[in-house]
C-alpha cells in the first residue's frame, strides 16, 4: 500500500499538466453528477416518503372529462368514494381533502390586537388524516371534528406563535375578506408534523373538518379522495367496484331529480338521456407515481415530467462517462513512458498482481481526490444562482443518500476505468516490451480513436438535445395563443377591489384618466392557467364538458380576441342568465350558434377565433368565456407601445391606494411573465441540462486537447521531417485537423439517429411542440467542428512552428 501511494504521488509530480487536466475534468463531472442527482433523487422520491405511499391510491374517475380512458380527474364525487370505503374490506382507510391550496388571511391575537397573517387552509376528513398517517406533535388530531376547530402544521404553529388551545381567526371567504370577523374564531386542537417537502401534501399548512359537505351532492366533483389498500389488494378491482357503486349512486340521484328535470327540460329531452352510458371509468393511481402521471388532469398532483427527469439522469451519467474516457486516454498516453519502468520492476521480481494493484490504486486516488474536490465545489454552489434551479437544498448533509450513491459510482468508475489499462500495461513480456512502441502501434491508435469517438458521439447528442430544449422554449414563448398578449400588464386585485365591483369600477375610472392605458379588464382567475373550473351540461342529447373562464364583458375587446360572430355587451355581465363566448372549434364541435341557450341559463353571445388558454404541455380543451361583472380578481391593462412602464405602474399603484388604502400595492407584471411562470419548472430543468451538457462538451474537448498533446509529443520527429521536406505550418495544422474532422463526421453519423430518438421521446411530453428540424442537427455539427478545429489548431500550433533541428536532436 505504501509503495502504491508513493507511485501515485510520483505520477502527480511527473505528469503535472495531464494530471491537472484529469483531476479538473473528473471534479467537474462529479460536481455535475451530484447537483443533477440531487434534483433527480428529489423527483424520483416525490411522495414516496409518506408512510405506505406505495399502498395509497388516488381515486381518479374518467367519465367527467371524457370516456376515452386517456384522461382522469383528480376530483371525484364524495358519496361514491365514501360508499366504496364502506363496502371494501380491502381498504384500510380512506378520506377526502378539498385540495384548493389558496392562501387566505388569518389573524392571531397579540397584546389585545389582531395581527394579520397568511395561511393555506384546506378542508379534510379524519379518514384522510388516517390514510396519510399524519403524526401529532401536540394535541389530538381527531378533535378537529368539533365545530370551529382546526389543525396546524408544526412549522406554521411556530411561525404564528400559537399552540394547542390558542385561537386563530379565519376569513369567511378566502378571496374577499379584508377584515377580521370575531365570529370566525377557531381553536387549535392539534399540531401535526409537517408533511414531507417533496410531496403534494407539503402545502397543507392547516386543516379544518370537511364534515358532511358534499355527501348529498353525487354530481359534484370537488374532493380529492385517497384510499390505503391492504397488502396484496388489486387496485384495478377496487377501481371497477367504484365504477359500479358510482353508477348506483348516480342512478338513485337521477331518479330523485327526474321530476324536476322533466319540468325544466321537458319529457322528450329527459327521456333521451336514459340512453346515455353513464358508466364512469376509474383508475386507482398510486400516490408514489402521481408526480409523473400525465393522464391525470391536475395542476397540483403531477407537476413532473418523466422525459425531463430521465434526460437529467442521462446527462449525469454521460458527463461522468466522458470524464472517465479522458482518464483512460490519459493512462494509455502514459503507457510508452511507463512501460520501461514496469518491465524493470518485473525483471527484478515484482509480482504482476502487485503492479496491477498499484495502477488500480492510482486510478482510485485520482477519482477520490476529484470526488472530494467536487464536494467542496458543490458546497460552494449553494450560494450561487445555480442553486435556484434545483428544487431542494444542495447541502451535503441534506443529501447523504446522493453522496453514498455518488461514492459508489465513483469507486465503480475507478475500477472500470483502471482495470483494463492496469492489465494491459503489465501484460507485455519484459524481453520484448522495449522493442515496440505502444504510442505508434495500430492497436494504440485504434483504442485512443475509439475512446475519443465515444466522447464525440455523447457530446453531439447532448448538444443536439440542448439546441432542441432552447427551440422548444422559444416555441412556447412565441406560440400564438389567439390574442395579443404583448403590452399587457396584470396583477392580483387587492381584496376590497376583488370583493366589491363598485371598488373595481372606481379603480377603472381613475386608470382611464391615463392616456397610456388603452383598456382595463379583469377575470376571476388567470386566463392562461393549468387550473380550470369545468362545467358539465347536457346539450342536444350530448354531455358537454367545458372549461370556464369568468371574465368582464370587455375582456375580448381589451385582449384583442378576434370575434367571428356576435360578441359581449356591457349589460351581459349583470343579466339573470350567463352570456358566453366560445371559440370556433368549440362551436363547431358542439354545434353552438349565437343566440342559442344552453341548459336554460347560458346564452351563446358570440364566437371567437381559437384560443390556447392552457400551458402547451396540455392539449387544449373546450372553453367558454362567461361575462360576469363580479369577475374582478385578476386585472389586465393594455398599455400603449412606447410607454414608460415604471411610471405607468407607479400610477396604477397610486390609483389602487386611493381606492383601497388598507392593502399593500400588488405586484404588477407583464402577462408574458405570468405565462412564463407556467413553464418555470421545465425551463429550470432545461437550463440545468444545457449547463451540464456544455460542461460535458468542455470535458470532451479537454480529452481532445490531451490527445493532441500526446500525438504532437510522439510525432515530433515526423513533423520535423515533413518541415525539412518543405511542409508549411498550415499543412502541418491541416494534417492534424484532417483526422479529427473525419472523426467528427463519422461520430455525427452515429450520434444523429440516437439524438433524433431521444429528442422525439422528450418532445412527446408536450401537446404542442417544435418539429424535429434537420437544421438543428447541422447547427450542432457546425458547432462541434468549429470548437474541434479551434482546439486542435491551438494545441498543435506550437509543434507545427517548432524548429526541426530541435526535434531531431532530442530523438
Give the predicted meaning of each segment.
Residues 1-5, 10, 14, 18, ...:
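Membrane-helix entry/capping segments
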Residues 5-17, 21, 25, 323-366, ...:
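Intracellular coupling helices
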Residues 14-41, 304-340, 368, 447-472, ...:
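Hydrophobic alpha-helical transmembrane segments of multi-pass inner-membrane transport and secretion
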Residues 21, 28-62, 381-390, 458-487, ...:
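Alpha-helical transmembrane segments
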Residues 36-107, 115, 213-214, 221-226, ...:
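Membrane-proximal extracellular/periplasmic loop immediately following the first transmembrane helix
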Residues 125-137, 152-304, 506-681:
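Mid-to-C-terminal secondary-structure elements
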Residues 283, 363-430, 461, 471, ...:
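Small-residue-rich transmembrane alpha-helices
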Residues 297-387, 401:
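Hydrophobic alpha-helical bundles that form the membrane domains of multi-pass transporters
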Amino acid at each position: 500500500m505504501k509503495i502504491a501511494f508513493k507511485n501515485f504521488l510520483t505520477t502527480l509530480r511527473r505528469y503535472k499538466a495531464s494530471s491537472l487536466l484529469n483531476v479538473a475534468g473528473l471534479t467537474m463531472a462529479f460536481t455535475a453528477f451530484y447537483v443533477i442527482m440531487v434534483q433527480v433523487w428529489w423527483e424520483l422520491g416525490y411522495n414516496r416518503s409518506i408512510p405506505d405511499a406505495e399502498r395509497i391510491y388516488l381515486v381518479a374517475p374518467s367519465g367527467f372529462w371524457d370516456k376515452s380512458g386517456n384522461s382522469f380527474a383528480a376530483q371525484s364525487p364524495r358519496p361514491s368514494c365514501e360508499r366504496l370505503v364502506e363496502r371494501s374490506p380491502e381498504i384500510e382507510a380512506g378520506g377526502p381533502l378539498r385540495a384548493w391550496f389558496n392562501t387566505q388571511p388569518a389573524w392571531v391575537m397579540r397584546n389585545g390586537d389582531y395581527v394579520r397573517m397568511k395561511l393555506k387552509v384546506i378542508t379534510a376528513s379524519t379518514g384522510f388524516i388516517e390514510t396519510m398517517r399524519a403524526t401529532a406533535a401536540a394535541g389530538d388530531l381527531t378533535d378537529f371534528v368539533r365545530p370551529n376547530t382546526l389543525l396546524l402544521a408544526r412549522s406554521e404553529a411556530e411561525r404564528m406563535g400559537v399552540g394547542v388551545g390558542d385561537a386563530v381567526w379565519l376569513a369567511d371567504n378566502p378571496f374577499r375578506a379584508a377584515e377580521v370577523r370575531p365570529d370566525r374564531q377557531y381553536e387549535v386542537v392539534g399540531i401535526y408534523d409537517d408533511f414531507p417537502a417533496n410531496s403534494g401534501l407539503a402545502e397543507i399548512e392547516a386543516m379544518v373538518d370537511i364534515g358532511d359537505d358534499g355527501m348529498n351532492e353525487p354530481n359534484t366533483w370537488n374532493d380529492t379522495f385517497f384510499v390505503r389498500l391492504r397488502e396484496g389488494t388489486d387496485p384495478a378491482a377496487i377501481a371497477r367496484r367504484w365504477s359500479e357503486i358510482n353508477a348506483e349512486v348516480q342512478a338513485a340521484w337521477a331518479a330523485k331529480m327526474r321530476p324536476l328535470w322533466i319540468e325544466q327540460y321537458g319529457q322528450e329531452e329527459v327521456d333521451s338521456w336514459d340512453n346515455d352510458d353513464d358508466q364512469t371509468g376509474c383508475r386507482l393511481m398510486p400516490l408514489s407515481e402521481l408526480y409523473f402521471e400525465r393522464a391525470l388532469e391536475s395542476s397540483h398532483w403531477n407537476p413532473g415530467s418523466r422525459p425531463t427527469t430521465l434526460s437529467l439522469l442521462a446527462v449525469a451519467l454521460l458527463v461522468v462517462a466522458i470524464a472517465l474516457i479522458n482518464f483512460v486516454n490519459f493512462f494509455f498516453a502514459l503507457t510508452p513512458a511507463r512501460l520501461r519502468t514496469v518491465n524493470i520492476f518485473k525483471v527484478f521480481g515484482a509480482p504482476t498482481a502487485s503492479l496491477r494493484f498499484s495502477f488500480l490504486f492510482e486510478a482510485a486516488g485520482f477519482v477520490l481526490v476529484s470526488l472530494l474536490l467536487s464536494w467542496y465545489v458543490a458546497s460552494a454552489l449553494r450560494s450561487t444562482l445555480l442553486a435556484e434551479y434545483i428544487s431542494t437544498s444542495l447541502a451535503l448533509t441534506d443529501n447523504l443518500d446522493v453522496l453514498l450513491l455518488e461514492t459508489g459510482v465513483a469507486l465503480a468508475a475507478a475500477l472500470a476505468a483502471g482495470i483494463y489499462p492496469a492489465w494491459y500495461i503489465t501484460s507485455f513480456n519484459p524481453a520484448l516490451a522495449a522493442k515496440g512502441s505502444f504510442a505508434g502501434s495500430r492497436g494504440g491508435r485504434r483504442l485512443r480513436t475509439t475512446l475519443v469517438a465515444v466522447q464525440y458521439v455523447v457530446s453531439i447528442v447532448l448538444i443536439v438535445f440542448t439546441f432542441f430544449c432552447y427551440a422548444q422554449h422559444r416555441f412556447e414563448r412565441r406560440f400564438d395563443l389567439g390574442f395579443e398578449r404583448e403590452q399587457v400588464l396584470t396583477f392580483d386585485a387587492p381584496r376590497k377591489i376583488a370583493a366589491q365591483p363598485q371598488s373595481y369600477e372606481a379603480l377603472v375610472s381613475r386608470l382611464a384618466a391615463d392616456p397610456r392605458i388603452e383598456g382595463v379588464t379583469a377575470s376571476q382567475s388567470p386566463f392562461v392557467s393549468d387550473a380550470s373550473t369545468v362545467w358539465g351540461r347536457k346539450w342536444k342529447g350530448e354531455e358537454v364538458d367545458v372549461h370556464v373562464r369568468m371574465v368582464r364583458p370587455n375582456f375580448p375587446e381589451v385582449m384583442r380576441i378576434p370575434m367571428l360572430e356576435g360578441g359581449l355587451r356591457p349589460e351581459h355581465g349583470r343579466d339573470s342568465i350567463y352570456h358566453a363566448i366560445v371559440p370556433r372549434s368549440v362551436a363547431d364541435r358542439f354545434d353552438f350558434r349565437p343566440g342559442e341557450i344552453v341548459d336554460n341559463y347560458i346564452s351563446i353571445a358570440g364566437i371567437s377565433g381559437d384560443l390556447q388558454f392552457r400551458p402547451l404541455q396540455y392539449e387544449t380543451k373546450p372553453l367558454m368565456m362567461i361575462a360576469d361583472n363580479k369577475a374582478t380578481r385578476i386585472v389586465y391593462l393594455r398599455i400603449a407601445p412606447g410607454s414608460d412602464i415604471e411610471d405607468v405602474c407607479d400610477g396604477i399603484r397610486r390609483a389602487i391606494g386611493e381606492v383601497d388604502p388598507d392593502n399593500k400595492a400588488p405586484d404588477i407584471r407583464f402577462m408574458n411573465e405570468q405565462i412564463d411562470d407556467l413553464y418555470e419548472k421545465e425551463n429550470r430543468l432545461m437550463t440545468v441540462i444545457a449547463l451540464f451538457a456544455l460542461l460535458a462538451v468542455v470535458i470532451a474537448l479537454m480529452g481532445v486537447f490531451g490527445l493532441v498533446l500526446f500525438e504532437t509529443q510522439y510525432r515530433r520527429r515526423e513533423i520535423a521531417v515533413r518541415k525539412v521536406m518543405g511542409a508549411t505550418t498550415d499543412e502541418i495544422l491541416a494534417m492534424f485537423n484532417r483526422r479529427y474532422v473525419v472523426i467528427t463526421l463519422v461520430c455525427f453519423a452515429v450520434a444523429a439517429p440516437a439524438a433524433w430518438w431521444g429528442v422525439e421521446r422528450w418532445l412527446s411530453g408536450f401537446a404542442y411542440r417544435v418539429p424535429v428540424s434537420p437544421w438543428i442537427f447541422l447547427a450542432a455539427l457546425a458547432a462541434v467542428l468549429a470548437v474541434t478545429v479551434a482546439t486542435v489548431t491551438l494545441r498543435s500550433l506550437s509543434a507545427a512552428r517548432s524548429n526541426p533541428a530541435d526535434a531531431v536532436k532530442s530523438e
